[in-house]
Design a protein with these regions (language model features):
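Cytosolic, membrane-interface loops and tails of multi-pass inner-membrane proteins
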Residues: 1-12, 62-89, 183-208, 255-264
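Intramembrane alpha-helical segments
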Residues: 7-16, 82-170, 250-257
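Extended hydrophobic alpha-helices typical of membrane-associated regions
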Residues: 9, 227-290
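Residue-level signal for inorganic ion chemistry
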Residues: 18, 69, 90, 140, ...
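Hydrophobic transmembrane alpha-helices of multi-pass small-molecule transporters
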Residues: 27, 106, 128-131, 152, ...
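Small-residue-rich segments of transmembrane alpha-helices in multi-pass membrane proteins
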Residues: 27-33, 83, 144-159, 204, ...
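Membrane-embedded alpha-helical segments that form the functional core of polytopic membrane enzymes
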Residues: 29-32, 36-68, 78, 102-110, ...
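Multi-pass membrane catalytic core of lipid/isoprenoid biosynthesis enzymes
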Residues: 48, 52, 70-120, 195-240, ...
């Protein structure tokens, strides 16, 4: 009984470490990409190994990021409670977790098709290198978005084993969306970033300009969501989903308050998790019902 409790505690700690709930940012777009690529429901083989690959890749990347950033996390009052600064988990233990997840990712990619397997090392480099970008460029927000954009692109490859135009539009949408709300989230750390030599758009250009840039990125994201209507011949259900997403994005930018962690969590995470689900549900209903 005690052993089972320890295992449960460890699973909970690792789930918190990699922010498992944040899978909602990438998974919905990966599902859309799979459905469009398959022109329907993909095979169980593709769905199973595609999901395993996605979860393993993001678990490894998030855990690696926590190891790389732990010294900064320990100095930042906002992040000092995280697992590594508080020594709830050991660095070596987390690095083994990273290695295991990346190994699972490569194996899952190989189970999908040759293209996914060949690209898997490049994908690992991409998602791991993000952890260092904030040390030398304010474009780290876009790079983060770029890494998460690999989810819908990789999902398309998983189904077809071929390059195409549509997944790169989906990937660009994800990149701009993620970068925009990461800028909003980063506005909480302007002074900390400036004092410790970390680069971010808010710390370099200031709060107001940073939020303007985030708004521009989200505006372009919306235009690309609209562009998918004629490209994919989407119907009114998808259009309604886009309209709801626009309202949620406007709400997100309206309520921004860097001094309030609770409000910033809603603006940066909660509303965007709803947006991803709205787009997923509207795209799926549009495809299967119309």
């Amino acid at each position: 009984m005690e052993y089972a409790r320890k295992i449960g505690t460890k699973i909970k700690l690792y789930s918190e470490l990699v922010m498992f709930s944040h899978t909602l940012f990438s998974l919905p777009f990966a599902i859309i990409s799979m459905i469009w690529a398959a022109e329907g429901v993909p095979s169980w083989h593709v769905m199973l190994w595609g999901l395993i690959a996605l979860v393993a890749a993001r678990n490894g990347a998030n855990a690696f990021n926590r190891v790389v950033d732990q010294s900064f996390d320990a100095m930042n009052p906002r992040t000092a409670h995280r697992h590594l600064p508080k020594r709830l988990l050991a660095s070596k233990e987390v690095l083994w977790f990273v290695v295991v997840n990346y190994a699972i990712f490569i194996f899952a990619a190989g189970m999908l098709n040759t293209l996914c397997f060949i690209l898997s090392p490049a994908a690992i480099f991409l998602i791991s290198s993000y952890s260092y970008t904030k040390r030398f460029t304010y474009l780290s927000h876009l790079y983060l978005g770029f890494t998460i954009a690999s989810a819908p692109i990789g999902a398309w490859f998983a189904v077809t084993g071929q390059f195409a135009f549509t997944p790169f539009i989906l990937g660009t949408i994800v990149m701009l969306w993620i970068a925009g709300f990461d800028i909003i989230y980063g506005s909480q750390d302007i002074e900390f970033d400036r004092n410790h030599g970390l680069w971010s758009i808010p710390s370099i250009f200031g709060l107001k300009n940073g939020l303007r840039i985030a708004a521009v990125l989200h505006s372009i994201m919306v235009l690309l969501l609209i562009a998918l209507i004629p490209i994919r011949q989407l119907g009114w259900i998808y259009v309604v989903g886009v309209i709801v997403s626009i309202v949620l994005l406007l709400t997100e930018h309206k309520i921004i308050k860097p001094s309030s962690r609770k409000v910033m969590k809603i603006a940066s995470y909660n509303l965007n998790q709803v947006i991803s689900m709205v787009i997923l549900i509207s795209a799926m209903c549009d495809y299967f019902l119309l």
